Amino acid sequence: MRVLGIDPGLRRTGFGVIDAEGMRLRYVASGTIVVPPALALPERLKVILDNLRQVARDTRPDVAALEIVFLNTNPASTLLLGQARGAALCALADSQLAVHEYTALQIKKAVVGTGRAAKEQVQMMVQRLLSLDGTPAPDSADALACAICHAHVGPLQARLGGLSAATGLGGGTRVRGGRLVG
């Protein structure tokens, strides 16, 4: 399974692509889309949209994983981040990719083992898990971590989806805190 992970941002959007076969992970590509701050908001969103479309065309992922927007103390920042995330979602929908969303806590826990990991810890674990020669840039590392999170959690979710169909629990059933919730 090839996973495209995205760490959305209006100034810098990180992307990372990995191949996952069982617990084996292989690095494919990563980078950061740097959006010129002088552009008007619609043009900035278009830069994100166009670049992520190109990444999807070039790397041909099977699925995408996206970090869920956090609530910031500044509502305007949260809204702007949400718009960048919307541009990313449009690019993924245009590329006909299934999108799975994870919180920063879930991503850190899947990659480092604790949801309170520092950025440097995430970068170090991404480097180790993917056998990279150097430490990935922060935005790329976050996107790769999102992809790794899906590689670890996605197959379990798929199996639980089959379980929910067999047990009649419904499609909205998820795992939260080690328990099935509806």
Swiss-Prot record:
Identify the residues that bind Mg(2+) 1. Answer: D7, D139
Gene Ontology CC entries for this record: cytoplasm; Holliday junction resolvase complex
Q: Which cofactor does it need?
A: Mg(2+)
EC number(s) from the headed UniProt entry: 3.1.21.10
- Where does it reside? Cytoplasm
* Reactions performed catalytically: Endonucleolytic cleavage at a junction such as a reciprocal single-stranded crossover between two homologous DNA duplexes (Holliday junction)
Annotated GO biological processes are: DNA recombination; DNA repair
Instruction: Give the enzyme class.
Output: hydrolase
PANTHER family assigned to the protein according to its UniProt record, in alphabetical order: CROSSOVER JUNCTION ENDODEOXYRIBONUCLEASE RUVC
The entry describes its oligomerization and partners as:
Homodimer which binds Holliday junction (HJ) DNA. The HJ becomes 2-fold symmetrical on binding to RuvC with unstacked arms; it has a different conformation from HJ DNA in complex with RuvA. In the full resolvosome a probable DNA-RuvA(4)-RuvB(12)-RuvC(2) complex forms which resolves the HJ.
| Protein family (similarity comment) | Belongs to the RuvC family.
Instruction: Tell me the protein's name.
Output: Crossover junction endodeoxyribonuclease RuvC
